[in-house]
Amino acid sequence: MSGFDAVLLVAVLLLALIVLGAVLVGVRAVRGIAGAPRPEDPAFIAEKDRQEQSLAALRSAADEANSTVDAAKSAAAAARTEAAAARAEAKAARAEARRVLDGARAEADTILERVHKQAEADAEQLRTAARRSGEREAAVLATTTREQAAEVERRAARMDDRERLHSEEVERLAERDRQLSAASAALAARESTLVDRDRELAQAEDRRRRELERVAGITAEAARGELVEAIEAQAKREAALLVREIESEARNTGEERARHIVVDAIQRVASEQTAESVVSVLHLPGDEMKGRIIGREGRNIRAFESVTGVNLIIDDTPEAVLLSCFDPVRREVGRLTLEKLVLDGRIHPHRIEEVHDLARQEVVQLCQRAAEDALVEVGITEIHPELVSLLGRLRYRTSYGQNVLKHLVETAHIAGIMAAELRLDVPTIKRCAFLHDIGKALTHEVEGSHAIVGADVARKYGESEDVVHAIEAHHNEVPPQTIEAVLTQASDACSGGRPGARRESLEAYVRRLERIEEIAAGKLGVERVFAMQAGREVRVMVRPEDVDDISASVLARDVAKQIEEELTYPGQIRVTVVRESRVTEIAR
């Protein structure tokens, strides 16, 4: 019995019980009616009506139960029909499965038979292949055996030949031994004869020597000493002549070779750099821009010169202004500041200060980029970042009018060419030459010559001792001890000594202006100092909280007096002390 049949049976039983209960209640109600009091009693009538209603409800419930039972019976019949159909389908499925199983068994038997036949055929092929392989191996083994037998025969023949040759060699050695014995006997006899002759010759030599000593009146030892002294003096003279000739030839050859190397290096470098100028030209989009640069009553040009420390020269030159300053860094910052102001169009004192700060930052970046480009051009890698920053400072540093960074690049190229000609370590020598003036970036901050300062900096940032020694010895503060130091000196001299590289007058002029600024900057309360108008004017910016108006006058006189006492200069120098008070409030 399935689960559905069981549920259906339980439902039928429950309905039957409900119907039975209803019938019993109806029977009890009928009995109550039969034994009830008279119909005239109202209570009886009400009770009767209630019982009739209950009976009617029971009848309707019985009818519903009967209908439910009928539905359940019909559902059970349908379920039995479905179960019969399912049993029929299951029987058909079992028959189909049996048929498929029989077919599979038949197919498996066929496959097994085919596989068995294939296995027998493969086994037969393997047996045939094994038989053929065995035959081939047997043939190869037979061939190898024959070859080995032939080799044994050949070895036996060679052994026989060796034995025969050995016997012949033994016979030859025995014959030679007999000959050597006879020769030894003859030599012994001859040696005895020679000994006797040597004795006789010695006696004759002794007699001759005594006779010579008697005739010459001098002993043999004294004569030997005089002869040795004469020969020694002659040998010394000849050696001295030979040494002088060799030294002269070496000196001439060395000078010629050195001259050839230096000339070749300078020709191959062919630098275009000459002395730096102290004036920069800025082209303007139009002459009307000059009026905006000057400003109302000249306030813009005064503010520009006060902030940058650069002389701004505006003349009749069409669409151009000149910027003059001995300090290349200051001049470049001023040029960039003015260029940005012209492009922006807003030119007033506050804007000049803002753009000046931006220009200074840009110049720092330009210096860093210039140092990196120089390193790439020379071919130097793995250098400390601090050394790169110091090299960038040299982008706007000059020595006797020659740009120091370009001088370092040129010196490195010359040193590399000379090192290659001499077959030396080119990278190390180029590194020595490129870093030899690194100390010039710190001469304003550290006391001492730039060679010693540069050597200390290079040692601090991990450069080798060869590089450090070449730096400290390139101006003979330390005697040069290595070939790297000597080549660094030579390449430095070639770069600085070529025509057009340096100007002594420009260097003296720059030093005079630097000294003027140092004198003014050394006073108490001074914030900034600018040498203007080619040194004919000094503008001193003071801190208003440290210097009052009376002290400003005293400061100007002190600076002028010290300049008169310490410097020699043409004409006059005007000292201008600028004291500016600024008060800023913020409106909220």
Curated annotation (Swiss-Prot):
Enzyme class: hydrolase
Pfam families linked to this entry: HD, KH_1, RNase_Y_N
SMART domains: HDc
Matches recorded under InterPro entries: HD/PDEase_dom (IPR003607), HD_domain (IPR006674), HDIG_dom (IPR006675), KH_dom_type_1 (IPR004088), KH_dom_type_1_sf (IPR036612), Ribonuclease_Y (IPR017705), RNase_Y_N (IPR022711)
GO BP: mRNA catabolic process
Compositional bias (Basic and acidic residues): 148-162
One Gene Ontology cellular component: plasma membrane
Residues of the HD domain: 404-497
Region (Disordered): 130-162
Gene Ontology molecular-function annotations: RNA binding; RNA endonuclease activity
Keywords: Cell membrane, Endonuclease, Hydrolase, Membrane, Nuclease, RNA-binding, Transmembrane, Transmembrane helix
Subcellular location(s) per record: Cell membrane
CDD domains: HDc, KH-I_RNaseY
EC number(s) from the headed UniProt entry: 3.1.-.-
PROSITE patterns listed in its UniProt record: HD, KH_TYPE_1
Domain KH as annotated: residue spans: 278-359
Record's function text: Endoribonuclease that initiates mRNA decay.
NCBIfam families, A to Z: HDIG, RNase_Y
PANTHER family tied to this protein: RIBONUCLEASE Y
Family designation: Belongs to the RNase Y family.
Name by which UniProt lists this protein: Ribonuclease Y
Species for this entry: Salinispora arenicola (strain CNS-205)
